[in-house]
Every structure is written in structure tokens, then in C-alpha cells.
Amino acid sequence: MTALVRAELLKLRTIRTTWALVAVSLGIALVLLGLQLRNAGLAETASLGTTASTRAILVAPGSAALVILVLGVLVATGELRHRTIGATFLVTPARGRVLLAKLLTAGLAGLGLSALGLLVTLVIAVPWLAANGVTADVVNRELILVALVTLAAGPLYAMLGLALGALVRNQTVAVVLGLLWFLVGEGLIGAMGLRWLMPWLPGGASRALARDITLPGLLPAWAGGLLLLTYVVALAVPAWWLLQRADVE
């Protein structure tokens, strides 16, 4: 399994789209970080140095979750799109092991991207705050938990994208479906008077994991993470079943 994961990571590193997604993810985090630093203390925004403000800074990398979702789809569908999956199955006939290796690879990639975003955020934010005479307490229990769930969101979203891509098997369709669901679909469900259902959808689970205190009725953070993992399994199991029976070139 270790060799399979290493091979999948090597494939991922050699694709230019991967690095484009890394750049987009960091760009989103930096833009939101800049907005938070600029707007702190205005209107209803917490002042710099407060726990609420520092919390908003720490969750900035999590705003690129949909980019990480797309990265997971890329891991699942890259070989299908380029018609190289047949060679992979010749080397490793156990297709379930290949799917598991891709799932682990997506998780590692998502974790790495979340960690990179969080690191870049801290490297920029802490010196900037210090230069402006603001001392941010980033080591209290609440903020440590926020940092941890920001890290956890990356692998969960990447594995969710992987499972979706493995089930749909078409890269473009999987990306469009994933983005439409999070950007439009869940909002439509809420607009239809089914707001009670929102906490149990993937987006609601993500907000619960991020400890979004602005939205009422969300699950606890641990339950949100567990619910996201349940969605991963719910998509991965039928994807595995179909993969066992699929004809590949």
C-alpha cells in the first residue's frame, strides 16, 4: 500500500493542474486574510487582537475547501481521462487497493494543502499584527481547536472529491456536480423551506467542522467531521462496487 500511495503522489506532483490548484488555494486564503486584516474593527467585524479576529484569520485557509475538493476529483479521474488506468490495474490487479491508495493520497494532499495555507497565513499575519502593535494570542485552547479543524477540513474535502470523482468517473462532470452542489444546490434546499435539513448536508457538516458560530442549529464540530467522513464512505462504497465491474482500456 505504501508503494501505491507513493506512486499516486508522484503522479499528482507531475501534473501541472495540481500546482495551479495549489496556487489558487493559497491565493484565496491570502485574499481573505487581507480582507480580514483590512476590515478588522469596522462595522460588525471584530477588532484585531481579539479571539474572534484571530479565529477569522485562522479559518482563512479553509475558504479554499472547494479547490481541495477539485484536487480530490483530479486524483480520482486523472488516469481515467488520460486512459492510463489500465496500466495501473495491470500492475495492481486488486482494484480496491488502487482506490484505497487514491483515497489516502487525496487525504494526504488535502492535509498538505491545508497545512501550507495555515502556515502561510500565520507567517504573514503574525508579523503584520506585531508591526501594528497588536499581540494576537494564537495559543489559547479555542484557537488551537480552530487551527486543528482547519487542518482536518482539507483531507476530508479531498477525500470527498476523490469519492465523487471515482463514482462519476468523468472529471468535468464530477467537478461541475461538486461545485454546483456546494455553491447552488444546498442554498436552493434552504430556500425551499427545508432549512432543518441544512445541518445534515455536506455544507452544513463543513460549517459545523469550522465551528461557525454565526449559524444556529449546527452539529458539534466533531459530529460535523464525522458526518463528512460518512459522506465520503457513502460515495466511495458504490464507487468501489462499480470499479470492480467496469471495463477499462
Predicted regions and their residues:
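Secretory targeting signals
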Residues: T18-L74, L99-V168, R207-T230, A234
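Helix-capping/transition residues at the boundaries of transmembrane alpha-helices
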Residues: K11, T77, T88-L90, G161, ...
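Transmembrane helix segments
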Residues: V31-G34, Q171-R207
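Junction motif at the cytosolic side of a transmembrane helix
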Residues: L227-E249
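Membrane-helix interface segments
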Residues: T17, A94-G96, N170-T172
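Transmembrane helix boundary and interhelical loop/hinge segments in multi-pass membrane proteins
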Residues: V70-V91, G96
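Transmembrane alpha-helices and adjacent helix-loop boundaries
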Residues: A76-R81, S114, L156-A158, Q171-T172, ...
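Aromatic- and glycine-rich beta-strand/loop motifs that create alpha-glucan
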Residues: M1-L26, R169
